[in-house]
Every structure is written in structure tokens, then in C-alpha cells.
Amino acid sequence: MTPRPSPMYLFIAAVSWPLLKGLFRLREKGKEHLPAAGGFVLAANHNSNFDPWPLGITLFPKRYLRFMGKSELFWTPFKQFATAAGAFPVRRGQADMEAMATATQLCREGHIVVMFPEGTRRKKGLRKKYEARAHTGAARIALDANVPLVPAGIVGTDRLGKLAQLRVAYGPPIQLDDLAGREDAPQVATERLMAAIEDLVASA
């Protein structure tokens, strides 16, 4: 059974859909690559704190997203809002095993978990894959949960103030089957993932 979103998530998405489609002219491509059912890790480049927004709207209303949010967001009065919006806390700057375990379990339960391998927003002008240090968390979660690892490229979220067009491109799941049992599986999968993300950003 596909997990269902909270009423707050539905409200946010319903209000956001005409805003993103109209004001920001949101366009997406490659949705045919997304698994129709079941959990998976959706990994994208990280331009701004608004990155989950267009991802969620392009999949609404058929699927909804879960994503890590910095632990500072989970203080009253924002905790209930963040949780209802699909977020769960992560302590940035350290290996948060609890957040990783939560993400892995959510994938196993059929959720789509959004990850940003770069960990933090790219500095202005940072575009090439060798300039952005990627973490292996997204690949580790996909490998541990035995779910697809799907790349996405996001363009425009760092220029919302200029009403830049928002574009999202999805790619086919990263090849993981040949990595079974390899100690370097997370690193190799991450290298493949980041190469795919960079191609999607360029073509979005």
C-alpha cells in the first residue's frame, strides 16, 4: 500500500501547485523513469532550502516525499509543521545514524526519501561535480534498503527572488546490482549518482 500524506502536506501541495506552475512556470521531464510504486531514494543537487518544493509538486498528487530537515527546525512551534510537511530531523555536520536508520526504514515502508548528496547548498556558481563534495548517505540508504536510487536535477530554486523558471529533470535509477558485496559500493554508487545528477542539471 502506498503511504498517504498528512492533511497539512496535502494543503501545502494544493496551495503550492498553482503558484509553482503559474508564477514560476515549473516544468518537469523524465517522470517516466520514476518507479510507479514502492519506496526509493530520490537524490538531487542542492541549490537552496526550497529544493524539496518543486520535487514534491512534480509528483503530487500520486506520490509524496519524505526528507531530512536540519534539527534546528524541529523546535516548537515549527516541529509539528515540519513533521506534517514530510520532514524528519538530522543533525548536520556529524554522522547521524538515527536519521540514516529512519530514512532506510521509510524506504522499506514504501516512502520516497529525498536526499541531497552534497549535504549543504552549493556556493554561488558551483556547478561542476568535482567542485561539490558528495556524501555517500543516499547510496548507503538505497543499498541497505534494497530500493532504487533515482537521480534528479533541479534548476532555478536559487533564483526564486528573480522569478526564475523552475525546472526538474529525473533520470533512470542508478545501476546498483553489480555492486553487491563490494566494500566500495557506496562510493562507486555515489560517483555514478553525481555524474547522472550533473547531466540532468545541464539538460533540465
Where are these regions (language model features)?
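Alpha-helical membrane-targeting segments
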Residues: 1-25, 75-85, 160-163
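Non-catalytic C-terminal accessory region of glycerolipid acyltransferases
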Residues: 2-8, 98-204
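Helix-to-loop junction immediately C-terminal to a conserved catalytic motif
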Residues: 9, 15-46
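Catalytic core of membrane glycerolipid acyltransferases/transacylases, capturing the structured
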Residues: 12, 35-94
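A generic structural signal for well-ordered alpha-helical segments
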Residues: 19-21, 60, 81-82, 106, ...
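Structural motif corresponding to alpha-helix initiation and N-cap regions
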Residues: 28, 75, 97-100
